[in-house]
Amino acid sequence: MSLLGRDYNSELNSLDNGPQSPSESSSSITSENVHPAGEAGLSMMQTLIHLLKCNIGTGLLGLPLAIKNAGLLVGPVSLLAIGVLTVHCMVILLNCAQHLSQRLQKTFVNYGEATMYGLETCPNTWLRAHAVWGRYTVSFLLVITQLGFCSVYFMFMADNLQQMVEKAHVTSNICQPREILTLTPILDIRFYMLIILPFLILLVFIQNLKVLSVFSTLANITTLGSMALIFEYIMEGIPYPSNLPLMANWKTFLLFFGTAIFTFEGVGMVLPLKNQMKHPQQFSFVLYLGMSIVIILYILLGTLGYMKFGSDTQASITLNLPNCWLYQSVKLMYSIGIFFTYALQFHVPAEIIIPFAISQVSESWALFVDLSVRSALVCLTCVSAILIPRLDLVISLVGSVSSSALALIIPALLEIVIFYSEDMSCVTIAKDIMISIVGLLGCIFGTYQALYELPQPISHSMANSTGVHA
């Protein structure tokens, strides 16, 4: 069972049966053929593990700098607000998908299909005629966002591997406050990326979520261990934050928004995870529990990290930790967690692109094309990480554009489109419009600031360190 329960034979056969409508024809290559409820599916615990791992990524380590960019008061409050809005929009998306699946008598509709079918019910003639572009737009944004996550993961793992290997001779057994060491790299970071590349290619060949849940459990254990060490250090002797600004400059706040919205990485996995549950009706409880844990963790780490290091807060909190073997292990454990998280985030673009690719070949070539496309996409994320020196700003850009649209703008507008004709209250309409405006403003101004900062010169070491921890 793959993430979306795809079966090559049924998928290829469905192409020969003839669609019932133009919309179904256009979406047949990405429709998920799900298992009936009650068959082998994910348990609540397995789903919770996947949900946590999807949302606890590299962005978590950059939250102290994000709080610094917003201010000691404005940062945590804004992070809480973004978290609540994101979860609310996840619930909206789930409700819209469930409503459409019941109306159309479908077992399941994905994000793109929900957008397309929703536009088909819109009173506007032009939108109805071009409803399929709603699915294309969502699919494009999902691919860009998820592959952007994967590119960050590549740089993160390579940078940490480089630091652990090349700074081994200056790493001590005594843990003292960090002295920032500027060492000339022995090997280019691209060499470390190429070392990681074949292992990630093999990892993404695993399509079974129940198998991946084992790796997710291991990833959560290593991440929990690294978080325990980080919290143990930052909570020891926190200085009184009297000199820290409660509100930062508005320009840096725009970068905070892009980073914060990017940090909530799991919006693309919400519908597939619910689809793969043995009892999908339990997903709401899993979502609220999991995202509550995530939001609390984000606020605590970001706020305490900034209070601990103040103006010296680095792009990743790991750069502020003592240069000893105990805290070097944080990089190793977190990198292991990110390694397995790569496979989860990779599933979404793979399941959008691969069905189209295999529909162009005969059944005998389906498996070969599947594995080839997976390998090519992993290589693409590697090349992206190699070519982009300021990945921190690129991720802020991706967060401002793609993540804002997927997490805030589209779900809110989709609720209006789908439920407007069903006596939708004015309060709900106003709420959805406000959410869309917040997402749109963040998208516009966050994009502007990221593009403004992108051409600015930056040292090689800073490019590496900031690039992986956005």
From Swiss-Prot:
Residues that span the membrane, as ranges: 47-67, 72-92, 138-158, 186-206, 211-231, 253-273, 285-305, 338-358, 368-388, 393-413, 426-446
One Pfam family per UniProt: Aa_trans
Side of membrane Cytoplasmic, spans: 1-46, 93-137, 207-210, 274-284, 359-367, 414-425
Tissue-level expression: Specifically expressed in testis.
Kinase listed as a keyword: no
Keywords: Membrane, Transmembrane, Transmembrane helix
Extracellular side: 68-71, 159-185, 232-252, 306-337, 389-392, 447-470
Main location: membrane
A biological-process GO annotation: proton transmembrane transport
Topology of this chain in the membrane: Multi-pass membrane protein
One cellular-component annotation, GO: vacuolar membrane
Name of the molecule in the record: Proton-coupled amino acid transporter 3
Organism listed in the record: Homo sapiens (Human)
Gene for this chain: SLC36A3
